């Protein structure tokens, strides 16, 4: 599923069958999937999934969400660990793991370190993955990374109007983007 393709090749978000599918998924998972249309990344995932697979029932949709979250988390972690190696000269390993849902046919959970990666939007997933990397390095390596170059403090991964970013905890300026 390629969510980076032109929007013109995707199902229109007001298509009645698409909206009915979202309502069915929302009921099955007790989650407002129509609310996920408010984020560009969530909308792209849902439209691409419907376009590519049709109105798949909940048990077949759940693994698609699991894979979507895992792939995004792994990409962000790989990019951040490359950056951490460049900044520190050290090689780190931060686990990305998936746990199956306790509910039959439910959506599983993805974790970076101990941080859950939830939602459908790549920016939100990038923020959670970055927090997971940062906490894991602090807990396991006793390392504050990344550092704000102006204040030598650890910034916080935050959603900004421009996407995921490391934001200084002292003056709230953007230190660096977080890949998403």
Predicted segments with their positions:
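Histidine (H) residue identity feature
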Residues: 12, 27, 31, 68, ...
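Cys/His-clustered metal-coordination modules, chiefly Zn-binding fingers
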Residues: 111-180
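General detector of N-terminal leader/presequence modules that precede the first folded domain
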Residues: 1-88
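Charged, alpha-helical interface segments at or near domain boundaries
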Residues: 49-129, 133-140
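Intrinsic-disorder/low-complexity coil detector
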Residues: 5, 12-15, 56, 94, ...
């Amino acid at each position: 599923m390629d969510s980076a393709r032109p929007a013109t090749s995707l199902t229109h978000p007001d298509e009645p069958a698409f909206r009915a599918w979202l309502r069915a998924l929302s009921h099955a998972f007790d989650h407002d999937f129509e609310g996920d249309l408010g984020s560009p990344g969530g909308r792209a995932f849902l439209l691409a999934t419907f376009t590519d697979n049709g109105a798949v029932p909940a048990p077949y949709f759940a693994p698609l969400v699991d894979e979507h979250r895992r792939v995004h988390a792994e990409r962000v972690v790989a990019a951040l660990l490359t950056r951490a190696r460049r900044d520190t000269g050290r090689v780190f390993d931060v686990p990305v793991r998936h746990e199956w849902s306790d509910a039959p046919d439910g959506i599983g959970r993805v974790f970076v370190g101990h941080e859950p990666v939830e939602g459908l939007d790549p920016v939100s997933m990038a923020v959670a993955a970055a927090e997971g990397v940062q906490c894991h390095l602090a807990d396991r390596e006793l390392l504050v990374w990344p550092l704000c170059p102006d204040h030598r403090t650890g910034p916080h991964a935050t959603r900004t109007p421009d996407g995921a970013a490391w934001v200084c905890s002292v003056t709230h300026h953007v230190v660096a983007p977080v890949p998403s």
